[in-house]
Each structure stands twice: as C-alpha cells, then as structure tokens.
C-alpha cells in the first residue's frame, strides 16, 4: 500500500512537470507569434512612411466656340387644321427672320409638332373633375440653332421681341455655350496637373532629406467646368457649366511616389 502511495505521488509530480512544460511551450509560442505580428506591423508602418501622396492641379481659362440656342412657338385653335396652318405660317416667318440675320439654313433645326387637347374643367371641393368641355388644340414646335458664330447668335437671341411684335408667339431660352476642343484641353490639363503634383512631391522629399523614387500610383480626379470669376460651387461628381461663354476648367491628379 505504501508503495502504491509513493507511485501516485511520483505520477502527480510527473504530471505537474508536464503541465509546466506545456504551459511554457504555449507561452513561448504566443511570444513568438506576437513578436512576428509586431515585426510585421513595424515593417508595414515603415513601408507606408516610404510613400509620398500628393495632389496636383491643372487649371485653364477658355472661351466657348459653339453656341446652342433653343426656342419654341405655339398656336391655339378650336380646329386642328387651322392650328396647323397658323403654326406653319409662324415657322416660315421665324425661318425667314433667322436667314435674314445671317444664320445658315443648315444651322436651323425644327422639331416635330407636339399636339395637346385643351379642356375647360370644373372641380368639386375635393379637387375632383366635375365636368370638362373641349375647347380646342394647342400646337407647339421647337427650333434649335447651333452655330460657331457665337456673338451673332447671342445678339439674335436678344432681339426676339421683333418676332413677338410681328405676331409670332416665340418663347426664347437662354443660349448654351460649349467648347469643341474640350478633349485636347483636358489632355493638356492632365499633363499640367501631373507636373504640378510631381513638383510638390519633389519639394516634400527634399524637405525630408530624401529623394523621390518611382511612381507607384496615379489617379485622375474630378473634371470641373465653371464660369470664370464666379462663386459657382464645385461638385463631387463634376460640374459642366453651359450658361457662361467664358469658362474655367479644373482637374486634379493624385500621385503616389516611393521615396529613398
């Protein structure tokens, strides 16, 4: 029996030693693993510190070389045939007026005629239609003038009262202004923005006592076109002003460089 007790004590001692060894192994493994994570984090931190991120700006003032002027005219009549005849008369008057002002015929585009029926309606206290009586037709036609003679079309759009006084019910919209060489302009601005970004990166590296390395990444920002000398807001999705003849275009380039 005494021998049995001694054997049990020896077993407990051996088990305690095994447990202690297992504990040491687990702790050692945890230390090794945490050391690996810390080293890796340090490595990544140094990697991030070896990168310069800069944003360059390209900006250009320009003047539109294309104008688009939209307008419309209407005629009302109880008889559809009479309404068409009156609208045709106004269309010819408008076309002849534009030609007399020096607008080329190929620059004038008339849309198809829109027709709507007119009714005289009465309503109850709940705004439901109580009765309606047909009163005639309203015919509408749009006309668009697109030209590179910007100033000429501008002046004509301001003189439409001459047509209105002659009986043509013309509704004139504000002209829209465009630039036909926008693609070329955009390429030049990208080059300018890239150059500006690189100069900024070189200056930052110089101030840090380092040298600029290879380009890691480049990303074009939003392209904006706004009116010159205006308080027009920039948009995250990009602005494209068409109401002003004189415009300013802006674009940004985001570059990431290695430093050494």
Residue ranges of model-derived segments:
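Short, Lys/Arg-enriched N-terminal segments with co-localized hydrophobic residues
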Residues: 1-14
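Short, charge-dense linear interaction motifs
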Residues: 12-260
């Amino acid at each position: 029996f005494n021998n049995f007790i001694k054997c049990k004590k020896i077993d407990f001692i051996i088990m305690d030693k095994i447990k202690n060894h297992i504990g040491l192994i687990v702790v050692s493994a945890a230390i090794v693993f945490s050391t690996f994570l810390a080293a890796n984090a340090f490595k990544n931190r140094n990697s991030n510190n070896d990168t310069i991120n800069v944003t360059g700006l390209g900006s250009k003032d320009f003047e539109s070389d294309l104008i688009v002027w939209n307008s419309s005219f209407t005629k009302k009549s109880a008889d559809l045939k009479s309404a068409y005849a009156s609208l045709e008369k106004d269309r010819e008057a408008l076309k002849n007026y534009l030609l007399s002002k020096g607008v080329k015929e190929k620059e004038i585009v008339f849309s198809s005629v829109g027709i709507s029926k007119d009714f005289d309606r009465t309503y109850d206290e709940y705004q439901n239609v109580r009765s309606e009586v047909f009163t005639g037709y309203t015919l509408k036609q749009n006309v668009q003038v697109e030209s590179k003679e910007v100033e000429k079309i501008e002046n004509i759009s301001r003189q439409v009262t001459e047509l209105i006084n002659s009986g043509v019910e013309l509704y004139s919209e504000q002209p829209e202004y465009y630039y036909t060489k926008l693609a070329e302009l955009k390429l030049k601005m990208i080059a300018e923005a890239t150059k500006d970004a690189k100069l900024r990166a070189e200056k930052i590296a110089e101030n840090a006592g380092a040298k600029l390395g290879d380009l890691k990444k480049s990303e074009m920002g939003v392209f904006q076109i706004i009116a010159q000398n205006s308080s027009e807001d920039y948009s995250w999705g990009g602005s494209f002003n068409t109401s002003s003849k004189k415009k300013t275009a802006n674009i940004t380039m985001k570059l990431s460089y290695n430093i050494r």
